[in-house]
Amino acid sequence: MTTGARPKEEYVAEPQLLPAWVNPDLDRLMGVHKERDGSYFRSWAESKVDLPAGAVFARINGITPTSQQDYATVQSGPNTHFVWNSDLYYCNHSCAPSLECDTSTWEMRVSRDRPLKKGDVLSVFYPSTEWTMDREFECWCGAGEGKCCGIIKGARDMNDRCLQRFWLNDHIHALRKQRANIPHL
């Protein structure tokens, strides 16, 4: 008589690193570091995995949508923002970013320019999502002369020569096109 039951060994699976879109376990993909030096506090994220250029690093999920912009939100459309509810919050700005935050596909992807290596700092180019920013800041990314944009602002207020070097979200392209079509007074 056949019972249809599978042998026990078919239920045993070896642990493996699952892609983020299958099992969004960021602890397997990234580590967060925090340091305090007197009154100065800094934090950053590092990769725990090697991935090729353009690969999906993680899906963007578990976020809180908001219409209010502040220093901790990410712009996801012309009038929409969200708050991270994950360690992806610790991906800082760089003018040589290791990741791209794509709000049209809800993916964090490895930069198209280079692969991601274990130990790399996880970073994004903030103006790739932000049209305006709550707070502009002096960049300390260390990308080097001719690569670092200097003062980081929203894409609206950044130099076009600087922005042309970076991957930008669809809503940033649309807002730039809209601004270009408005006659200047």
Q: Model features per residue range: what roles?
A:
Residues T2-C101:
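Catalytic cores of histone-lysine modification enzymes
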Residues C95, L99-L185:
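C-terminal SET catalytic tail plus cysteine-rich post-SET Zn-binding segment of SAM-dependent SET-domain
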